[in-house]
Regions:
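Secretory targeting and sorting signals
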Residues: 1-27
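N-terminal "mature-domain start" segment
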Residues: 27-89, 132-133, 138-139
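Second-shell loop/turn segments in exported
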Residues: 34-39, 99-108, 196-203
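Short Gly/Thr-rich strand-loop-strand
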Residues: 60-68, 124-180, 218, 222
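A short acidic-to-branched-hydrophobic micro-motif
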Residues: 84-122
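Short, well-ordered beta-strand elements
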Residues: 100-104, 180-181, 186-197
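A short, structured loop/turn motif at beta-sheet edges
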Residues: 107-112, 149-159, 185-189
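Surface-exposed amphipathic alpha-helical segments
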Residues: 193-222
Length: 222
């Protein structure tokens, strides 16, 4: 899915926000973009809303979807030029060291989603390329400790979890930040959730991302 299409990494005050969009990386160029009103509305229905986060203190909201090309590595360059993107939406929220980013993509056909998943998420080079790209984007005060693909509940036709642990040093203190990339897809809809927070909150973050993935993909109209 546009699982790794765009990865932007920001390190601030010991928190790492890794923003992704959709569920497919770059490969042989870009997918074709042919937005239509119905699929744009369907994409907006799937992303995180403030009410989905429950507690107060969250700031953020809708932002421009990232449609740029994703990482390219020698052993990882999935074909995307035959995919047609008909809808996209994105929201980002932050709260005291936590960052939640969601981006949805609607493709023209179900078959395109299946191709997208097989080429990018299931590709043997995905983990290695993602880790390399993340590490390259971090500043000198941060480094990737680990990055791997983990099991995730089959909440939809397609579901996967990539988890990174990043060490961040600031003012003589080093903290470890968890960065989870959750990818789910159903019918023509793809959703990427990026959840960032302290490693000490791993259990709470895992529960939150499963709850969100389940409720958001249930809102898919396309």
């Amino acid at each position: 899915m546009q699982a790794t299409r765009s990865i932007g990494i920001v390190v601030t005050a010991g928190a790492v926000a890794l923003a992704t969009a959709g569920v497919v990386p770059a490969g042989d160029g870009k997918e074709q973009i042919k937005f239509n009103p119905a699929d744009q509305a369907a994409a907006r229905a799937v992303v995180i809303r403030r009410a989905d986060l429950g507690s107060s203190g969250w700031t953020g909201g809708p932002t421009k979807p990232d449609l740029s090309s994703g990482p390219r590595c020698a052993n990882y360059h999935p074909k995307v030029s035959d995919l047609v993107l008909t809808g996209a939406a994105r929201t980002t929220f932050q709260n005291a060291g936590f960052a939640f980013d969601s981006q949805s993509s609607v493709l023209k056909t179900k078959r395109m989603v299946a191709l997208d998943w097989r080429r990018s998420v299931l590709a043997p080079g995905a983990v290695t390329c993602l880790r390399h790209t993340i590490g390259k984007g971090l500043g000198s005060n941060a480094k990737v400790v680990s990055f791997r693909k983990l099991s995730f509940p089959q909440l939809a036709t397609y579901a996967a979890l990539f988890r990174g642990v990043i060490s961040v040093s600031s003012q003589g203190t080093t903290v470890r930040v968890l960065t989870d990339l959750v990818l789910v897809g159903r019918s023509r809809t793809e959703l990427t959730l990026t959840i960032v927070g302290p490693v000490s909150a791993k259990s709470a973050l895992s529960a939150a991302e499963r709850r969100l993935a389940r409720s958001l993909i249930a809102r898919a109209r396309a």
